[in-house]
Each structure stands twice: as C-alpha cells, then as structure tokens.
Amino acid sequence: MTSDNTLEITLDTWIISDTHFFHENIGRYCSRPENWQELIIKNWNDLVSPDEIVLHLGDFALGNKSNFEMLTGILNGRLFLIQGNHDRLSQSFCVAHSVTLIKNSLLVELENHMKLIFSHRPIIPLEDGWINLHGHIH
C-alpha cells in the first residue's frame, strides 16, 4: 500500500463486500440462511490463505470493537477495508488489529492500463476510462 491510496491488485487478490457481520436485521433486507455468519467465516477461511490480500469494499461488521477483534483474529488474509456506511472504526484501531482502513476509494491501474476504482458506494459519474467496482447495493 502506498501513500497515494493505491494497492497492487493481482489475480490472487480476494474482493468481497457487505458481509455485515453481527447485523441482526440483515435477514429482513436480503435472504440469508440462519447460520450465515458461520458459513461466511468457513468459506472465507477455506478459500483465503493467511498471507493473501482481501480487499473488502465496506460494511464489514456492525457492533462493538470486540466483535471486530474476534473477526480479525479468526479470518485468514491481510484485510484492506474500504470504509462503508456501517464501518465506524478509527484508523488507529484498525491498524492495531492489522487492518488497513481506506477512507473513501482505492485507485488501481493495472499493467494493461485498465483503471479501476474500488469504493463502497457507486461513484457516478466516473472519469473516462475508469471502471468502478463497488458494494453497498444488495
């Protein structure tokens, strides 16, 4: 990660959004099985190795700091979190738990000159040539 809000994205980078861990009412908004949190954690850890990068496009978890600490302690990978509307943690708290918090968006230019902008909410309008990958819309 560099100071200009860039990150090297490769084919080994995992991208996910809107896990909403500890969101008690998420079932009202989108259909999830009863044990959805356990399934996400299991699938995450089955796929992601401890040294791989996970770029989370926001709304990682709700609730208190101990919930966040628990999740970062059991989920594999190096977490880069673009702050979503439900992510209310400070930069220093995230750093203390080995999570890189990205406040607004992440700009990435690939070797083939493709320009990507990762964000929680959709960015409209985009500058010419940029592709927006975002979460938020379920």
How should these model regions be labeled?
Residues 1-68:
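N-terminal active-site segment of His-dependent metallophosphoesterases
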Residues 27, 58-75, 83, 88-103, ...:
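Metal-dependent catalytic neighborhoods of phosphoester/phosphodiester hydrolases
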Residues 34-50, 77-95:
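A short, conserved beta-to-alpha structural element at the edge of catalytic cores
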Residues 40-43, 65-70, 103-105, 117-121:
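A generic local structural motif
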